[in-house]
């Protein structure tokens, strides 16, 4: 299903966190969650079913959350001995997560943490680890704004979130604003580089998560699964650990909130996704990829995924907060960018894509809506739900033929799924709409479309009819405005090429004349 560009579901970031509460914990020294520690291996099992009317208990899976370098943003700081410039990652993280069905059960608010653990429909069960150390009962006071947030993702369970007599009430309400959203495909891509096959039906098969690991930060990584015993988590997160601000955006799976960690005072973006919607849309695999890939990425132009946790209703991703919101919001306000700003933005995104491609990761959904703007016009590539990672020894030009030598019916079915269109219609390359094999060059095509949209204000193949858009893409029917810079046209024409092998490389983009001649005019606080 393709959504029209003027659909009300197109996301727009809104106002930042309410600063009235930002100074509550200024004197707090922070907790171990936000100290620089190596990422610990985690091995957990979960059970998932549709939300029940019970008091939710949250369980967390915490990655390292460093102290921010700048105000109001949770950016990464690590030991200089463990990184090279802004390209670094932890090779020790190896996570194995399992979704399995469970029977309906109930629990009371006064139950012990072990009973709460066993009654949750989405349960973590680490090996050789006491349950009391893994979770904690959520009997703390919770404001109405938190309950209001949870009920927005699942209205049927909203009454279960306000039954406690200990909870405070608040008249504070969050404001929402939406913009027309670009047409996107809704079919979940079935790409995977793991031998474990994800069955869309939770009642018939388990879903195993295996986090990507790497021996070096510069080599292409491969996906692996581990069953070793995990150490004690550094710290568990619950909704009680955060104060909620305004809504930053909303989508089909839930909303994104600006939150403040009470103990440390750090600001984050909390992405909330309804479990029922994830199961109904069969997007478990997409969520798995997003967590696997993004949690291992450490780059100045990529949004950090610090941690994730869940309760009986929702799954929560704790993300780096970008104070200026989406790039699309700024583009819509200014109509288009000049050559200086556009060239700087293309340079930053190219740096992020080079970092991803060196690690065998294809983003596959590059567009202004998935690019965040932080302080000093620093861009952050986000939303890795459509991304995929390929093995080092895999033929990168034949991603969908990972099981080409095996001919079992089940594998043939998986092969067909890998041909599914993913991403945004306006940014799809010809090889994807024609169901051909694709590789890293799909991101290069999308980079050319992004460059055109930043300079012109709209994608080159935009049309009122989906079939017309397909025809324009297949023929590469692109028209340039007369006022467009000649060097910019040259760059776009070398990126938006039908033959993937003839597209300009990312390193050549950095050295293109359009980038070189505008680079001295960029703001001095960016890439000195």
From Swiss-Prot:
Active site annotation, chain numbering: 365
Biased composition (Low complexity): 18-29, 59-94, 105-120, 185-230
One GO location term (cellular component): spindle midzone
Enzyme class: transferase
Biased composition, class Polar residues, residue ranges: 95-104, 129-155
UniProt keyword list: ATP-binding, Cell cycle, Centromere, Chromosome, Chromosome partition, Cytoplasm, Cytoskeleton, Kinase, Kinetochore, Nucleotide-binding, Nucleus, Serine/threonine-protein kinase, Transferase
EC number: 2.7.11.1
Protein localization: Nucleus; Cytoplasm, Cytoskeleton, Spindle; Chromosome, Centromere, Kinetochore
Identification of the protein by name: Aurora kinase
Lineage: Eukaryota, Fungi, Dikarya, Ascomycota, Saccharomycotina
Annotated gene: IPL1
